[in-house]
Amino acid sequence: MFDEEKLIEAFKTILNEIDPEPQRAGLKETPKRMLGYFKELFEGANYSNDDIAEMFDKQFEIGSKDLVIMNGIHCFSHCEHHCALMELNINIAYIPKDGKVLGLSKFPRICDMVSKRLQVQERIGMDICEVLQKLGMEDIMVVIDGRHACVNARGIKQPQTVTRTNCLRGRFEYDLPLKNEVLNSIK
């Protein structure tokens, strides 16, 4: 996906423009380090939601039909408008279909992979729901609280703001007590 040589040259150009001493020792290897950083941060750009669903399809048939809530999944992403950092707290709820549950470690992995793209917070929730739907789930709720550097650290500079988005599928769209049970579980 990434043309490593082009990226290294681009990083050198940026450093030459923003630093008065771009040749100093501390910056000598910075373009290569930036390449590794970008490859890690944007790894999710290499995969479609179908790919992600296939990667993390580890389900167990246990006969459960009870609500499952996982709170506090911590991820980072970058907004597509400024490439600014977004720090996200993601909460997922679902009702198992046909008694199948997804391995718990797969939820953070899915969240992490869809976050490793240039994104907007709303789409991250939609992408997580889409991946879970591809795994056969119907009743899904994704609640994301995000701190956006494009608001917190630049421009309007409002460091205390947190943006909440909800993505609802299935019963969560119309079952208010069920939706409230999830919202009440989020601290």
Question: In which residue ranges do the predicted regions lie?
Answer:
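A domain-level signal for the structural core that forms small-molecule/cofactor-binding pockets
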Residues: M1-K187
